[in-house]
């Protein structure tokens, strides 16, 4: 019941454009917490929040793209998303970004 209420409140704020609420919805859909699991909807809300610079949504959208959970992004977009997340202190984003650059430099 409380999860339902929280989801509906977050949904209202997400539709109003609040990136934290958009991120919460993305997490809920990704995990199936209080709502039916839906990776497409998760990526939709992560994309909305990432578009406003939300670091965790940027990371989640980049990872979702790498795992083919969402449609492909423009070339270099994954790196941009990871850079946003890394600039906000997400160690996982920095490590993944380094791994991507290393893999490109292999013969």
Task: Describe these PLM feature segments.
Residues 2-9, 36-45, 71-81:
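Structural signature of tandem alpha-helical TPR/SEL1-like repeats
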């Amino acid at each position: 019941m409380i999860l339902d209420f929280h989801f509906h409140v977050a949904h209202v704020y997400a539709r109003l454009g609040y990136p934290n609420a958009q991120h919460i919805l993305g997490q809920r859909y990704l995990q199936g917490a209080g709502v039916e699991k839906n990776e497409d909807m998760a990526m939709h809300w992560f994309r909305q929040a990432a578009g406003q610079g939300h670091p965790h949504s940027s990371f989640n959208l980049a990872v979702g793209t790498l795992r083919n959970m969402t449609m492909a992004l423009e070339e270099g977009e994954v790196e941009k998303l990871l850079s946003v997340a890394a600039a906000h202190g997400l160690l996982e984003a920095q490590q993944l970004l380094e791994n991507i650059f290393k893999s490109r430099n292999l013969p």
